[in-house]
């Protein structure tokens, strides 16, 4: 179906202002997923089941990692600031499952001031930060980013290419990823919160 987008002003109405109007056309794969329901949750909202440190066992019913860098509570997976006495500065938490089929990964994140984290897509990292402060420069220009508020990232993986958007605004049109691998979250600097992590494999 085809059609136009329109804006209407009724007679006698006050001035109405719009801004940041854009439209993103979906590829066939993404459209198929959006019309086929939500994906499977990667995070149960209560524990770190289904996640692990590399070469370690599934964290199972634990509500936090052994070094305290990751914790689960009330629907939020939190990446916590480092405690130098407990472990290394950089950490990565991985799904125990790997993904070879095309998929759509969706999640919400809320960054603390100057926070630096990342989302690993089959092993390759998409930066997830307090973009307004921590960049990188390419992402400082993102108009839709809401500092210290919830933002939504959607990643559509087709083959070895990922289309990544922030609140509907394109971050990466063709981000290169491996053919197979897990999803990961990085702990680098500051506090980062994630929620509503879901992955829908494309038929």
Regions found by a protein language model. Name each.
Residues 1-203:
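Carbohydrate-interacting regions of secretory-pathway proteins
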């Amino acid at each position: 179906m085809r059609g136009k987008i329109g804006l209407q002003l009724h007679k006698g109405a006050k001035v109405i202002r719009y801004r940041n109007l854009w439209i993103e056309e979906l590829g066939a794969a993404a459209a198929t997923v959006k019309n086929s329901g939500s994906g499977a949750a990667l995070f149960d909202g209560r524990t770190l089941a289904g996640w692990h440190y590399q070469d370690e066992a599934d964290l199972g019913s634990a509500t936090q990692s052994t070094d305290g860098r990751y914790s689960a509570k009330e629907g939020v997976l939190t990446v916590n600031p480092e405690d130098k006495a407990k472990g290394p500065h950089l950490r990565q938490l991985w799904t125990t499952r790997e993904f070879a089929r095309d998929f759509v990964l969706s999640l919400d994140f809320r960054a603390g001031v100057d926070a630096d984290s990342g989302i690993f897509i089959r092993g390759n990292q998409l930066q997830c930060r307090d973009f307004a402060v921590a960049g990188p420069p390419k992402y400082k220009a993102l108009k839709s980013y809401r500092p210290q508020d919830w933002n939504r990232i959607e990643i559509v993986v087709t083959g070895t290419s990922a289309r990544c958007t922030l609140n509907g605004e394109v971050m990466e049109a063709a981000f290169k990823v491996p053919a197979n691998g897990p999803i990961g979250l990085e702990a680098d600097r500051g506090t980062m919160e994630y929620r509503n992590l879901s992955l829908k494999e494309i038929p």
